[in-house]
Amino acid sequence: MLILISPAKTLDYQSPLATTRYTQPELLEYSQQLIGIARKLTAPQIGKLMSISDKLADLNATRFHDWHPDFTPQNARQAILAFKGDVYTGLQAETLTEDDFDFAQRHLRMLSGLYGVLRPLDLMQPYRLEMGIRLENPRGKDLYQFWGETITEKLNQALQAQGDDIVINLVSDEYFKSVKTQKLQGQLIKPVFLDEKNGKFKVISFYAKKARGLMSRYIIENRLTQPEQLKAFNSEGYFFDAEASEKGELVFKRHEQ
């Protein structure tokens, strides 16, 4: 099965590395095109485009300027260890074993506005370029038009290489829109995580994001190969609710903490 997760805005280029192994991103020629476009933007334009503070706009203008495609362990970091948002809090990649990284390299992909598709050990330089940003480019008005079918084609290659047609969709809607589902040669399964609040179960963003990371780790650590095995997921109090689930959607609930 192929697990899809979102990237994160928060990055970590300081912590000790859990592995020294690395690979190179496979779509860097596309990244270079986007960097070329982004470099033409002033810091105030970046701030407006991304709805971020002046300080963050300055940081990202500098990142775009400093970015260059010769990635080494000295100027870049493995994607799975560089991202540090809520999903990655659940994933805790810094405690994975070398065997876990091997499995993840075959079965986990991160979608990215700048890099398209990243494998866990792919090096990346720091950036901020969310998939939903309306960055005009030669292919259209936003990143969805820029990436077109490229991301889907890369996922199809990954599916073929890892041996089955199961796709576990743990990405946000913003990133999943970059996947052309009609062209995807896989069967989609979407885990949904509901937390109890005041007696009602609903999606609570922070918990749901972390749960996507927990589920990713559960699949990696247990080397899962069948969708049926996902139903045993019970990290941090979640349990499978068969009645609330339907074809293609597995619902997990957790009682109020």
Curated annotation (Swiss-Prot):
Record-level GO BP terms: response to hydroperoxide
Family indicated by similarity: Belongs to the UPF0246 family.
Name of protein: UPF0246 protein KPK_4750
Chain coiled-coil ranges: none
Organism of provenance: Klebsiella pneumoniae (strain 342)
GO CC annotations, alphabetized: cytosol
